[in-house]
């Protein structure tokens, strides 16, 4: 079984990769760049 800290880092990295584009779109919408 892998280390709990390693699992947490993998999950956080996965969340950042999957939610990254959505966050960028939200910031662009707030600034009115779209």
Swiss-Prot record:
<dbReference type="GO" id="GO:0015979">
    <property type="term" value="P:photosynthesis"/>
</dbReference>
<dbReference type="GO" id="GO:0009535">
    <property type="term" value="C:chloroplast thylakoid membrane"/>
</dbReference>
<keyword id="KW-1133">Transmembrane helix</keyword>
<feature type="transmembrane region" description="Helical">
    <location>
        <begin position="7"/>
        <end position="27"/>
    </location>
</feature>
<dbReference type="Pfam" id="PF05969">
    <property type="entry name" value="PSII_Ycf12"/>
</dbReference>
<keyword id="KW-0150">Chloroplast</keyword>
<keyword id="KW-0812">Transmembrane</keyword>
<keyword id="KW-0604">Photosystem II</keyword>
<comment type="function">
    <text>A core subunit of photosystem II (PSII), probably helps stabilize the reaction center.</text>
</comment>
<keyword id="KW-0793">Thylakoid</keyword>
<keyword id="KW-0934">Plastid</keyword>
<comment type="subunit">
    <text>PSII is composed of 1 copy each of membrane proteins PsbA, PsbB, PsbC, PsbD, PsbE, PsbF, PsbH, PsbI, PsbJ, PsbK, PsbL, PsbM, PsbT, PsbX, PsbY, PsbZ, Psb30/Ycf12, peripheral proteins of the oxygen-evolving complex and a large number of cofactors. It forms dimeric complexes.</text>
</comment>
<protein>
    <recommendedName>
        <fullName>Photosystem II reaction center protein Psb30</fullName>
    </recommendedName>
</protein>
<dbReference type="InterPro" id="IPR010284">
    <property type="entry name" value="PSII_Ycf12_core-subunit"/>
</dbReference>
<keyword id="KW-0602">Photosynthesis</keyword>
<keyword id="KW-0472">Membrane</keyword>
<dbReference type="GO" id="GO:0009523">
    <property type="term" value="C:photosystem II"/>
</dbReference>
<comment type="similarity">
    <text>Belongs to the Psb30/Ycf12 family.</text>
</comment>
């Amino acid at each position: 079984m892998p280390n709990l800290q390693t699992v947490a880092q993998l999950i956080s990295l996965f969340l950042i990769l999957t939610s990254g584009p959505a966050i960028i779109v939200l910031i662009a919408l707030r600034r009115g760049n779209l």
